[in-house]
């Protein structure tokens, strides 16, 4: 029987493999003071609500240009959520591009999205260039990918943190593509550009 399609290579790492704590990793991110402050607030908010038996949705949207630290921060978030037992896994981090979620034939896209999400259950699914899911009249199966992704975000809201990332304007356009995103994305984080001094020491994506 065999699979109907081949998913493009997916980066999957265990973010707990480092001997350092997640909080130490967070503090070592250079040039991201405002972002680190936001992550601490998110961690406190989620931990407090979990203690009260009101586990919030963990899904996020990262806005910013390439090289502003989005991937690095997403990895740290995965490790934080694992160490704090917010997510049930071991800090697994799966990274894909938005275009990787769209298949070429009818009915395959939903299965593809489901399989990718399944690989990240218990950890973080980081979807870079998520705005490539905007159909723009191309006649593909982008809408099917979005509909399936939104359903997966709801069905596994306590088991996974899905992070959508990309350029600010394009990401805002994506979120308007389907109103279901708004109720499922709990946290929005802006990643500013850096001057030449900060860029020389920043840990790039």
Model-derived features: positions:
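Conserved small helical "lid"/interfacial subdomain of P-loop NTPases
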Residues: 191-205
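Flexible beta-alpha connector loops of hexameric P-loop NTPases
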Residues: 98-109, 132-143, 189-190
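N-terminal accessory segments that target, anchor, or regulate ATP-driven/P-loop NTPase machines
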Residues: 1-17, 157, 161, 168-169, ...
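Short glycine-rich substrate-engagement loop in P-loop NTPases that contacts/grips substrate
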Residues: 90-120
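Conserved AAA+/SF3 P-loop NTPase catalytic/coupling segment centered on the Walker-B
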Residues: 121-150, 156-163, 170-176, 196-200
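A short helix-turn-beta junction within AAA+ P-loop NTPase domains corresponding to the substrate/partner-engaging
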Residues: 176-193
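Pre-Walker A (pre-P-loop) alpha-helix and adjacent loop at the N terminus of AAA/AAA+ ATPase modules
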Residues: 21-60, 79
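Walker A/P-loop
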Residues: 56-91, 115-118, 185
């Amino acid at each position: 029987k065999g699979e109907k399609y081949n998913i493009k290579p997916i980066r999957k790492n265990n973010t707990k493999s480092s001997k350092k704590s997640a909080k130490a990793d967070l503090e070592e991110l250079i040039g991201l003071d405002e972002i680190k402050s936001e992550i601490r607030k998110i961690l406190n908010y989620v931990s407090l609500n979990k203690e009260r038996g009101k586990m919030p949705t963990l899904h996020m949207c990262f806005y910013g240009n390439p090289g502003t630290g989005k991937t690095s921060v997403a990895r740290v978030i995965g490790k934080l959520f694992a160490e704090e037992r917010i997510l049930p896994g071991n800090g697994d981090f799966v990274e894909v591009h938005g275009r990787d979620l769209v298949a070429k034939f009818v009915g395959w896209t939903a299965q593809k999205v489901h399989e990718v999400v399944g690989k990240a259950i218990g950890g973080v699914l980081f979807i870079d260039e998520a705005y490539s899911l905007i159909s723009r009249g191309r006649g593909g199966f982008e809408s099917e990918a979005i509909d399936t992704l939104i359903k997966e975000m709801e069905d596994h809201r306590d088991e996974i943190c899905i992070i959508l990332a990309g350029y600010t304007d394009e990401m805002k356009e994506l979120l308007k593509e389907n109103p279901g995103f708004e109720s499922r994305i709990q946290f929005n984080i802006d990643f500013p550009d850096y001057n030449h001094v900060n860029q020389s020491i920043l840990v790039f994506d």
